[in-house]
Every structure is written in C-alpha cells, then in structure tokens.
Amino acid sequence: MSIVNKPAATSATKGKVLGKGLTIDRIYTTAGKHPYDEVTWERRDVVQTNWKSGEVIFEQKGVEYPDFWSVNASTIVTTKYFRGAVGQENREWSLKQVIDRVVLTYTKAGKEYGYFASDTDAEVFEHELTWMLMHQVFSFNSPVWFNVGTTAPQQVSACFILSVDDTMDSILNWYREEGMIFKGGSGAGLNLSRIRSAKELLKSGGTASGPVSFMRGADASAGTIKSGGATRRAAKMVVLDVDHPDIEEFIETKVREEDKIRALRDAGFDMDLGGKDIISVQYQNANNSVRVSDKFMKAYENGEQFGLVARASGEVIESVDAKALFRKLAEAAWACADPGIQYDDTINDWHTNPETGRINASNPCSEYMSLDNSSCNLASLNLMKFLKADGSFDVKNFVKATELIITSMDISICFADFPTEAIGRTTADYRQLGIGFANLGALLMASGLAYDSDGGRALAGAITSLMTGTSYRRSAELAGIVGAYNGFARNAAGHTRVMRKHQAATHAAKAQTTLDSDVWSEAKKEWDKGIEIGEKNGWRNAQASVLAPTGTIGLMMDCDTTGIEPDLALVKFKKLVGGGSMQIVNQTIPMTLRKLGYAEETVEAIVEYIAANGNVVDAPGLKTEHYDIFDCAMGARSISAMGHVKMMAACQSFLSGAISKTVNLPADASVEEIEEVYYEGWKLGLKALAVYRDNCKVGQPLSEGKGANKGTDSNTAAADSADSAHPVATRKRLPKSRPSRTTSFSVGGAEGYMTAGTYADGALGEVFLKLGKQGSTLAGVMDAFSIAISIGLQYGVPLETFVEKFSNLRFEPAGMTDDADIRMAQSMMDYIFRRLALDYLPYESRSAMGLYTATERQRALDTGEYTPDENTSTAPVAAAPKVVDTPKAPAARAAAPAAVKIEAAPAANNSTAGVGSSMELFEKMSGVKSDAPLCMTCGVKMRMAGSCFVCEGCGNTSGCS
C-alpha cells in the first residue's frame, strides 16, 4: 500500500511495562534442539499450470519443505507466500525462510515491547511458534505471510471496516480508502445507511442520489482494481439498515443484474465471474447484507407495518408490510444468494465497546464485526492436530497453543501498518483479534459424531468456548503486564457485562458425550479465571475470536474442511508429487469406521464402495444408524439447511465476533425455506447469515446450452456435427492363438467361470462367461453378453468405460465372494468387471475409480497412501516412471540439505479426465452441476469456504483469509 500508518506509541503499545513479562512453557519443543532439526526436509519442484489451457503460470525448482507436507500445501505456500522475484537471489526457496521472517519479527517485537520475562522465554516462544507453524497446527491470515519481515508495509490484518457519511467528500474518500485496501489484497465492509435515500431532498432542493447509486461507483472501482492485477478478487461487503427508505431497491439490485447475466449468457457472451464480458454488469464485486432490528423482526412475526426512516430528519416517510418486505428479501436470496442478513440488536448486545460507538457493519465474510474504521488480524487452529490417538480431544495442549497464538497476534499490533490513519488509531486503541479454527467437520467425523447432531454441536460449542475463554484469560494477563487496551476504561462496564454473558452461556451448556464433557469443564475454568483476572487488570483486547472461512490458510494446513464447515464430499481430488492427480477417499473415513468398531475387512469394503459411488448409501456392512456421521455439504446425503444453522448457533454465544458460513440449500429449495432459515437465525441468536441455493447463480462457465458456439462458422459447425454423427471404427481382431486366463468365482453362493483373452501386448480383447447349466436361459444370456462385450473391446471401447458402467450394479445373486481382492459384490456384473479392472487396467486408471487389490488397501490403511502392488497386478506393464533429481540449490544456499529423489507421478488418466478439483470430481460422480466460479489463475472450479470461494489448486480466495 502506498499510504500506511503505524499506531501511535501509547502505553498500550510501546511504553511502560506494568508487570513482569510472560513465562513461556514448552509444549512441543525440546530444550537445546531447534524444531527444524527434528524433521526430514526434502526439495521439490513446484510447477503450476492453468488446468484448462495447459499454460505454465508458475515454476520454481528446488524448494524445501518437510517431507510430510502435501504437494498441494507446498504449491500454495510457494506461489502465494514466498517473497522475491522468481529467479532472483532474494527469492525465498525454503519454508524455513518464510517461517523465520515471520516468527523472528514477532519475537523481536515481543522483546522490545516487554512481553517476555526473560530472553529464555523469548527463545521458547520463538521455538514453539516455529514448531506449530511447521507442523500445521495453526496459521496466521494471509497478510502476515505476504508482508511481515519484508521491506513492504507490515500489514497484518485481513479484515477492515470503513465508514461513510452523507457528504460527497466522505463518499469519494470511501472509494479511495476501499481501493487502497483492495490493492493490498484485503477486504473491507461498510454500512451505507447514513446516506440519504433517493426519496429525500438535498439542501439545494434537488433529489438525493441514494446509496444504491453510489454503490455503482464503488463496484466499478473494485472491478477495475481487480482487473489491474490485484492478488485476488476485491472482497467487499455493503450493508444497509432495514429501516432505510431505499431498502427495497437495495434488496433487488443483484436480482436485476442476474437477469441481465442470464440474457447475455444465452446470447453467447462470456459471463463467468472471471469472464471478459461480466464487467458490463453491475454490483458483482460485493456481498450485500440487510441489517435487521428486533423491532422489524417482531413486526414480521406479528404481521405489522414497519416504518422507513428519513436519514436527514429522522421521520418515518413510508410504512411497509414487514412480512412482505421479509418475503422480498427471501425471494432475492433464493434468486441470486444476495442479500445476506445481519441481526443488529444481537450484534450490539454482545458489543464490548458500546460507549465508543455502535457496530454498524462487518468485513466481507461477515465474521468480523466491530467499530467503524477498525481492523482485525486472524489466525486459525487446525483442530485435527488436537485429536489424540485414543479419540479424545487434547484439552491441555489446545489451551497452551491458544495462549501462545493469541499472544503473538497481540504482539503484531505493536509493529503493524494500516491503510488509513483512522484505522491505525482505532486498532491501536482497541486491539481487536480474531482467533478461530478450521477442520471442525473432519474432527467430528473422525470422532464418530454427525455434524447435524446434539453430540456434534456440543463438541463444537465446547471447543469454541474453550478457545475464546482461554484467549480472554490470556488477554487479561497481558493487561497486567503491558496494559489494557486504551478504550477499556471508557467501556469497562460494557466489556465486563459481555464477558459475563459468555461465562453464563458456558455454564448453562450441557455435555452430550464424554468427548465434550472434559472440554466444557476446562472452558468453565478458563472463563471463571479470566473474569477474575480481568476485573483486576482489565483486558488487553476488545475482541478475541471469530470463525473465519480459512480459505487459503486451510489449504496451507492440509485441512480437509474449512472453518466451521462440514466436509464437502467423501471423495477428494489429490495432487501427486511430480505431477498428475488421483481420486482418493477422505482419509478420515477409515479412522472413523475403526472407531465405530468395524472389522478391517468391512472397513476395506466400505471404503472401496465409497470410492466408486461417492456416498455411503447401501455400502456393504455399514449400519444405517451410522449414515449421518458421513453426511456432507453436498451429495446424496447432504446436511439440511437447519443443520447448518443449528451448528452456527451452537458456537455463536462463545465468540467475540460472528461466523463466516453459508447455509447451503438444494436447487429445488423454496423461498419459504429461505425465509425460515433467516427467521430461525434470528431466533437462535446468530449475528449474521447467508444462504446459497445450488445453481442460483448464472455467472458460470459457458460450456453447454445456448450460445456455446458463438463465433463459430455455421457451415463448419454443421460439417463437424455431420462427421461426428457417423464415426468410423475399425475392428481389431485377436490372433488365432492368443494368451488367456480362466478365473473361477463365487458370488453369494452362485459359482461361475470367466475366461479372458488378450492381444500380444496384454490388452484385453475378449471375455467368455460360464454361468448356469448349458442350454439354460441364464447361460444363453451370458453367452450373448460375452459376445457383445468382446466385440466392443475389439472395436476400441475402453475397458474403463465397461467397468464404470457395470461395476456396482445391484441385483441377486450378491454378497460375499471367494476373492480376497473383492470381498463383497453387489451382483455378478459388479464382480466380473471389478475383477477385469484389477487384472487388465493399469494401476493409475483403476486407482482413479477406487479399485485396489487387498494388498494395496492394507498398505493404504497402514501408511495412509495407496501404492501399486506390482506382484499381483497382471495389467500390461507401462514404462517405469522416471526418478528425477531436483536441481541443486545455488551456492549461496549451501546450508540446504541434499536434494532428495522424487518419483514422478503417473500421468492423468481417462477416469480423471475433465477433473481439476474436488468440486469438479463431485460433479462428475454425482451428475450434479455446481455454479461455483472458475479460478481466474489456474482455471479449476472453486469450492465454497464460509461465505467465500477458495481454489484448492492455487489457493486463490474471494475472501479474507
């Protein structure tokens, strides 16, 4: 940013130290041994391509990472967070360098500002922070990785709230401030309700423009900065109070624009969110939210009129039917997912600084809600790192980790830069922090708890309460050492009142299982202790916690799920070392099945079924009462809308801020359902809510339907169509003498024989099946079927196609088999084609369909990775993959370890053709299209993270983290 301001040095930042500094205990590290020396490091080549075009968009060779970091995580960190120009000496090349520049900056500032009791404590702080970042226990938000320790301004905050008044100077300054924040890759939100409506008069006697008119200018500015090369799409939030006279126009803005997008798309224009033609449509760069009051919601309940208030005079200038207005809000959200809703009285009832001013707005993702002209820096814990081997939650280490993280976050405010003087001043005076978590969905599944269950909600609430209670307790301790935040004295009564509300909610909570009871017990202790210390010292921070979407940083930590979200789907898309990709079953699933008491044989069968079908419905051996544990955000068994809302409500009372989360609804959801979600959100005490009905957006890739051939010569298209309508195939007959193998089998007690003949190169060319007595109907049908399959193979139909079509067909006989590789079969056809796949398809092709030998499955259960079983596979042997040495580091980096050999991954195969992300894999397996946008950098389909979208290929996000 070109304009930056550090907070003024005050007693709350740099000045006198009130008490002895912190004593830092070791959690994970060993005295006398640096964390880097405890792990194995390897060098990798990071090459990133645009998946759709094949263009190489990034390449850096010989980068250094711990061997347990995934390819995806290392790619994202290398492309997003390594500083310096690629190919230059100042370019970072190791994760060590990235962590060191951040951690050493924090440690130096902590010593300078009096946070530590001794140099030894500072060293322990440095080592523990390094260990946790290296082991993906937590991560700071993206601006920390972008800026800290570099020559750039030390911006650490991802979330900003601005303000605008009813003057032209203020409105034009809003455009400028927002633009500077977007330039730095962050997001901002503000409330436009102070601006006079288009129904009011100016002092000169003319009619006011109204806030919706000024939104056009801000939207165009954001779109221009995005097009000018910002690190990601501009993230912005626009809020309008429900009593504003222009509220109906505000609600309908995006609905009208979606109609335009639909018309332009059907005419053949490129209306993807990154498309060249989308810029002609307005209001596409912001999330819109309506701020509703309790007064309005009660009018809605009672079917009463509600007054719209003039901004200048404060008089009611129009009355509307509250039910009709709320219905219009739900209809707009049904049509285009905007606007969301924010509950004003609930937000301000939990406000710790009421004497300073009201909370009027939020950041773009809606998790940070605080004073105007303020900011918040975020960090998120990876909850799966606290799941112990015995299945319990590691309360002790979670508390210690939270203490350390919240301390480091507060230290960052001491040296941080800000985009405006007003934001710098407010942040220095109130020191808002936003600690949160990711991987909740994975933790619940691994613990055998359904996301939409009392047990799941209880554990989520307990962890949230423990996190926030510990953070505020440490904040109170810091206040005794380096002083309370400057605004505390003015707001002492209000802050203490909110602390007691959190405490009361924690004590009122009831444990549901032994898993959450220990967490609740510790949370109660933390709140009790924190309030006792806070009433003596005050608190260092006005806010401590939020639940952010954790888009990019969630991928950096190798999280299966983001923020508070459930798992997207049970089958994922995984990048492999050296290139290529494969389809894998979520690694949490085998762990969950074992915890539920299933035998290894059944675990293997269920995992194999999920790999092929993408869901657990009718999985062999899985009890129906366990189905809900594996429910996901999308798919055959998706979590209900109210399941999402109730999970948010379970956590909301234990957060300083709010929750970035979108409530997903199926495409056939009604307006009434959305109306119910918005109403129940208010009743359950949420602060904000957004909904997303599948396929409600039409700004998506132009691939099918009208306009797909825009610009194509009609004669050429017709000729191509005619050619494709009459394909010419040549039959490749088998030689007179050919190798074959006969397999005897039994499925559900029914026996049969299969003879498979091959070409000289080992490729399958014919199949003969012997079932039933000679002359029987069954025998005749199977003979005819064998001939059809054999002729298809000889005319070039891929075996993969037959396997995909015939495996998992269900009919009798079905059940146990006598084949160790295929323990359960849904039918004879299911067994036959899975056996053919194991015998005649290369490993890469069958692994993409989730088909493995018994040896391969056992190895995966032991090591977490599928590798080919060369001894049992009889498929044609392809050329062995090359072993590649990554280039040596430059001489100036002589301290780096020797390069390890990385085996190149198999090439992409037919089964993963057309798939570049987990979202696209879900679409292929389910047959359901998503309208998620394509990533503007690498071309793959993004997935939802909170109320934003994130690209799991390169880490780009439309949000703040």
Annotate the PLM regions:
Residues 955-961:
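Short Cys/His-rich micro-motifs in 6-15 aa windows
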Residues 944-948, 961:
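Short Cys/His-rich "knuckle" micro-motifs
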Residues 772-857, 862-871:
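Phosphate-backbone binding interfaces of nucleic-acid-interacting proteins
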Residues 749, 832, 947:
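Residue-level signature of catalytic and energy-coupling elements of molecular machines
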